Amino acid sequence: MGNQFKTLALLAALSGLLIAISYWVIGGSSGLMIGIGLAAVTNLLSWYQSDKIALAVYRAQAVSESQAPKLYRTVQRLSQRANIPMPGVYIVPGQTANAFATGRDPEHAAVAVTEGILNILPEDELEAVIAHELTHIINRDTLTQAVAATVAGAISFLAQMVSYSLWFGGIGGRDNERGGNPLGVLLTVVLAPIAATIIQLAISRTREFSADAGSARLTGNPRALARALQRLEATARQMPLNANPAFEPLLIINPISGQFLGNLFSSHPSTEARVQALLKLEKQLPTIA
């Protein structure tokens, strides 16, 4: 319950940040009402369309059992073991190696992996990665992450539009109420995306450890996920998956993890920390299974 409250508070903070941007940029009650409207639309859109948005961002393509038999049967088998509806199965084109899950609940969920991950992971490691993603679905992390990504993306987009407007003739200041202050606008453009990113980090980091543990319980093989994470990190650094940074928290591995600045501003814990946690969990597995 504590984690749920924290997550709801952080999501509310993201929406509040979106409203604040509109207030400072447009000014007064007009800016406030527009901001509230934007926050409402963005949250509703991400709630009902989160799976479609994330899949579109990564250009994921739905596949059938005949098209990707090993992947499809792995998702099917683990879904039955976890006692959840089987999610949609998608493949992201490209040789980078990564995976993610999305959807507002287990009945409206999808699991996506890249072509690269299918080429480099042996069967037990692929199973561990799929189990990790299914745990995100079971824990409803997919909804939280998608809402956070959509709102953070809207904040970054709005801040970018404001910066363009500053270059081409200025904005705001037409409302006779408070708002449209040039310094406030400038600070908003610079600080809002950073604040949105920090809030996203607070939402997503602990969820990766929980999903790793869920994978270990579901497969009974935490070492397989540890090996997969190490393999994925090495490959992702060489061939990062290019997409909107707001949606990077959805991925199982962050390409820049392992570096100090990468860890500081990463939506994921370091791969080293995750591997250590999994190896500790391996010793406890007979007790927790």
Swiss-Prot record:
<feature type="transmembrane region" description="Helical">
    <location>
        <begin position="8"/>
        <end position="28"/>
    </location>
</feature>
<dbReference type="GO" id="GO:0004222">
    <property type="term" value="F:metalloendopeptidase activity"/>
</dbReference>
<feature type="binding site">
    <location>
        <position position="136"/>
    </location>
    <ligand>
        <name>Zn(2+)</name>
    </ligand>
</feature>
<keyword id="KW-0645">Protease</keyword>
<feature type="binding site">
    <location>
        <position position="208"/>
    </location>
    <ligand>
        <name>Zn(2+)</name>
    </ligand>
</feature>
<dbReference type="InterPro" id="IPR050083">
    <property type="entry name" value="HtpX_protease"/>
</dbReference>
<feature type="transmembrane region" description="Helical">
    <location>
        <begin position="29"/>
        <end position="49"/>
    </location>
</feature>
<keyword id="KW-1003">Cell membrane</keyword>
<feature type="binding site">
    <location>
        <position position="132"/>
    </location>
    <ligand>
        <name>Zn(2+)</name>
    </ligand>
</feature>
<keyword id="KW-0479">Metal-binding</keyword>
<keyword id="KW-0472">Membrane</keyword>
<dbReference type="GO" id="GO:0005886">
    <property type="term" value="C:plasma membrane"/>
</dbReference>
<keyword id="KW-0812">Transmembrane</keyword>
<feature type="transmembrane region" description="Helical">
    <location>
        <begin position="151"/>
        <end position="171"/>
    </location>
</feature>
<keyword id="KW-0997">Cell inner membrane</keyword>
<protein>
    <recommendedName>
        <fullName>Protease HtpX homolog</fullName>
        <ecNumber>3.4.24.-</ecNumber>
    </recommendedName>
</protein>
<dbReference type="InterPro" id="IPR001915">
    <property type="entry name" value="Peptidase_M48"/>
</dbReference>
<feature type="active site">
    <location>
        <position position="133"/>
    </location>
</feature>
<keyword id="KW-1133">Transmembrane helix</keyword>
<keyword id="KW-0378">Hydrolase</keyword>
<dbReference type="GO" id="GO:0006508">
    <property type="term" value="P:proteolysis"/>
</dbReference>
<keyword id="KW-0482">Metalloprotease</keyword>
<dbReference type="InterPro" id="IPR022919">
    <property type="entry name" value="Pept_M48_protease_HtpX"/>
</dbReference>
<feature type="transmembrane region" description="Helical">
    <location>
        <begin position="183"/>
        <end position="203"/>
    </location>
</feature>
<dbReference type="GO" id="GO:0008270">
    <property type="term" value="F:zinc ion binding"/>
</dbReference>
<dbReference type="Pfam" id="PF01435">
    <property type="entry name" value="Peptidase_M48"/>
</dbReference>
<comment type="similarity">
    <text>Belongs to the peptidase M48B family.</text>
</comment>
<keyword id="KW-0862">Zinc</keyword>
